[in-house]
């Protein structure tokens, strides 16, 4: 049973969010072809994670057996988000470009899930590269929308693109290598002209094709791997969704 973790970070509502439409399209397409798929929804736009503070840092860098109840509470949200991540085979992130970078809620999510002892280890005996990821084998799909254009390598705004490099730099915390990242982009949103319409059509087609290919890969593998359950929590996550129609637009 494949598991999708769908992370939406747009502050916009469904009818106005291009990235929400793309994540819904990916999820629907994938589930139509792999009907036993489990989908975990994490809506950061509606339920933004807490920012990391001194209490989080103190608790995270304290050995688990030495944490008091106050420290456990400080890490409770992080634990829930990491539990969701651990369950996932594919992580689908709806990531609009805000001021050339990622939305604050998405950055807060990365800060909550990038945690020593849960998603990475730290050992100075490794020399200048002491960090090693603890998760692996996941595929990362980034579905993005940009008001302007030309942010790809070689584009006229490549130097202003802090979103794609930022996600790629953190992907190892999610258990995805750089070779396991697929990014699909809608551009020209603020121009609202034929270029934007063409970009949307191309992105929609690419999303369907990618979801179809990845779902087919899982169906052909027939691995039968069992993933642990993730229950609904007060931060806006829910699991065990098998949508064929009616997903967010």
Model-derived regions, located:
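Short, structured loop/turn "capping" segments at alpha-beta junctions
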Residues: 116-121, 136, 177-179
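Structural beta-sheet core signal
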Residues: 6, 93, 140-144, 183
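Short, structurally constrained coil/turn elements
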Residues: 33-35, 134-136, 175-177
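N-terminal beta1-alpha1-beta2 submodule of the flavodoxin-like/Rossmannoid cofactor-binding fold
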Residues: 1-95, 100-110, 115-118, 208-239, ...
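Short, glycine-/small-residue-rich phosphate/pyrophosphate-handling segment
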Residues: 122-173
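A short, flexible beta-alpha/helix-coil linker loop
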Residues: 10-13, 147-151, 188-192
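Glycine-rich phosphate/pyrophosphate-binding loop and the adjoining helix
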Residues: 153-249
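Active-site donor-binding loop signature of nucleotide-sugar glycosyltransferases
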Residues: 44, 145, 186-188
């Amino acid at each position: 049973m494949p598991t999708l973790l769908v992370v939406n970070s747009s502050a916009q509502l469904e009818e106005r969010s291009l990235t929400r439409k793309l994540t819904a399209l990916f999820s629907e397409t994938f589930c139509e072809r792999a009907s036993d798929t489990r989908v975990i929804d994490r809506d950061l736009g509606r339920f933004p994670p807490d920012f990391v503070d001194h209490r989080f840092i103190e608790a995270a860098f304290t050995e688990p057996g030495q944490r008091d109840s106050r420290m456990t509470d400080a890490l409770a949200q992080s634990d829930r988000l990491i539990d969701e991540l651990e369950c996932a085979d594919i992580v689908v992130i709806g990531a609009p470009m805000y001021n050339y970078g990622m939305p604050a809620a998405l950055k807060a999510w990365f800060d909550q899930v990038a945690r020593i002892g849960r998603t990475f280890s730290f050992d100075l005996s490794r020399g200048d590269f002491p960090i090693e990821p603890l998760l692996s084998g996941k595929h990362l799909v980034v579905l993005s929308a940009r008001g302007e254009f030309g942010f790809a390598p070689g584009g006229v705004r490549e130097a202003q693109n802090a979103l794609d490099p930022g996600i790629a730099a953190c992907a190892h915390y999610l258990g995805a290598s750089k070779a396991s990242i697929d990014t699909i982009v809608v551009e020209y949103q603020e121009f609202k002209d034929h270029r934007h319409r063409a970009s949307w059509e191309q992105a929609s087609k690419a999303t369907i094709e990618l979801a179809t290919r990845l779902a087919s890969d899982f169906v052909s593998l027939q691995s039968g791997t069992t993933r642990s359950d993730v229950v609904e929590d007060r931060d806006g996550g829910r699991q065990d969704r098998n949508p064929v129609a009616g997903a967010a637009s």
